[in-house]
Each structure stands twice: as C-alpha cells, then as structure tokens.
UniProtKB/Swiss-Prot annotation:
It comes from Bos taurus (Bovine). It is found in: Nucleus. One of its GO terms (biological process) is DNA repair. Residues 115-128 have a biased composition (Polar residues). One of its GO terms (cellular component) is nucleus. Belongs to the SOSS-B family. SOSS-B1 subfamily. Gene3D superfamilies: Nucleic acid-binding proteins. The gene is NABP2. InterPro entries: NA-bd_OB-fold, SOSS-B, Ssb-like_OB. GO terms for molecular function: DNA binding; single-stranded DNA binding. This is SOSS complex subunit B1. Phosphorylated by ATM in response to DNA damage. Phosphorylation prevents degradation by the proteasome, hence stabilization of the protein and accumulation within cells. Ubiquitinated in a FBXL5-dependent manner, leading to proteasomal degradation. Component of the SOSS complex, composed of SOSS-B (SOSS-B1/NABP2 or SOSS-B2/NABP1), SOSS-A/INTS3 and SOSS-C/INIP. SOSS complexes containing SOSS-B1/NABP2 are more abundant than complexes containing SOSS-B2/NABP1. Directly interacts with ATM, SOSS-A/INTS3 and RAD51. Interacts with INTS7. Residues 110-211 are annotated as: Disordered. Residues 133-143, 165-174 have a biased composition (Pro residues).
Length: 211
C-alpha cells in the first residue's frame, strides 16, 4: 500500500511522492533544445494547488477536470517556484473526472520569499559596497573648498598686506577728504591775508618809490 501525500505537505527535494489531484489549467507548450515538449499544468487537491511539469505526449492527453493519480513523483524549485515532476519510473494515471473536492488557495507554486530573501542580502552587500566607493570622492571636495578658501585668504594676505592697509586707508580717506574740504574753507579765509600782504607790499613799494 502506498501512502498519499497532500499538496500542502510537498517540500523541495521530496521524492517518491504519490498524489491524487484534479487538473485546473493546462499551460502552453514549450519546446526544449532536445525537441521535447513541456507543459506546465495547475493541479489541486483539498489542501491547495501546485504546478506540475508534464513532458511530451502525456501533456497532450491531460485536460482540465481530469482527476489523476501521480506515482513516484518528486518536487523541485524552478525559477523560485515549487513544482512537481514525474520521476523515473513515475506515472500519471487518469482515475476520474470533475467530481473532486479541491481548493486553489493556497497556491504553493507562488514564488517563495525565503529564496528571494537569500538572494537579497547578497545584493544589499554589493549595493553597500557600491556607495562606499563614491564617499571618498565626496570627502576631498569638501576639504578642497575649505583649503581653497584658506589658500585664497592666504594668497590675498600678501596682497592683503597692501590690501590690509587699504581698509584702514579707506577710513582715513574720508577724514582726509573732510580735512581737504575744511582746508579750502581755511584757505578761503587765508587768501585775503596773503592778498593783503602783497597789497601792503605794493603800497609800501609805491610809497618807497615816491619817496
């Protein structure tokens, strides 16, 4: 007597599986490089659904609604999805049609997050190593502007020695201009003085000449 396995109990790597299921859907035929025809069918029992890969003529005979007994099958992961296969010496036998209790949910052939989780850390490590490379270039530019600003100040310092006095001269110029403005006022008062002197001198010379 062979023990039957339910769809919910199928795990990757299990062999010598014996199941009874009903065919829900038949997929498109794909041809391999060796010329074999492969068809993926969706089957189910009362515990859930799963995909089974059927080869060559057997796939052409299977129709939706067929109740089939699988003997000596095995389970494997294909493209991240759990899939049933007919092993060596295995067989698919039609034992009825339509009258079977089944459930499409859960679908055990959906992508398993555990496999994607195993691939995710590898990608994240690569991504982490990727941004680490651009970080060093960002460091030097940050230091370069500071150094450039310091160098600019340093370079301005030598002219700044001339430029350093300029800012003090600039405040000195406004007072000097004020002084010049005040000077013309003083000079305005001044010219009558010197003008009187030459006039007095002229008179004295004239008087001296008359004398």
């Amino acid at each position: 007597m062979t023990t039957e396995t339910f769809v919910k109990d199928i795990k990757p790597g299990l062999k010598n599986l014996n199941l009874i299921f009903i065919v829900l859907e038949t997929g498109r035929v794909t041809k391999t490089k060796d010329g074999h025809e492969v068809r993926t069918c969706k089957v189910a029992d009362k515990t859930g659904s799963i995909n089974i890969s059927v080869w060559d003529d057997v796939g052409n005979l299977i129709q939706p609604g067929d109740i089939i007994r699988l003997t000596k099958g095995y389970a494997s992961v294909f493209k991240g999805c759990l899939t049933l296969y007919t092993g060596r010496g295995g067989d698919l036998q039609k034992i009825g049609e339509f009258c079977m209790v089944y459930s499409e949910v859960p679908n055990f052939s959906e992508p398993n997050p555990e496999y994607s989780a195993q691939q995710a850390p590898n990608k994240t490590v690569q991504n982490d190593s990727g941004p680490a490379a651009p970080q060093p270039p960002t460091g030097p530019p940050a230091t370069s502007p500071a150094s450039e600003s310091q160098n600019g100040n340093g370079l301005s310092a030598p002219p700044g020695s001339g430029g350093g006095p300029h800012p003090p001269h600039t405040p000195s110029h406004p007072p000097s201009t004020r002084i010049t403005r005040s000077q013309p006022n003083h000079t305005a008062a001044g010219p009558p003085g010197p003008s009187n002197n030459p006039v007095s001198n002229g008179k004295e010379t004239r008087r001296s000449s008359k004398r």
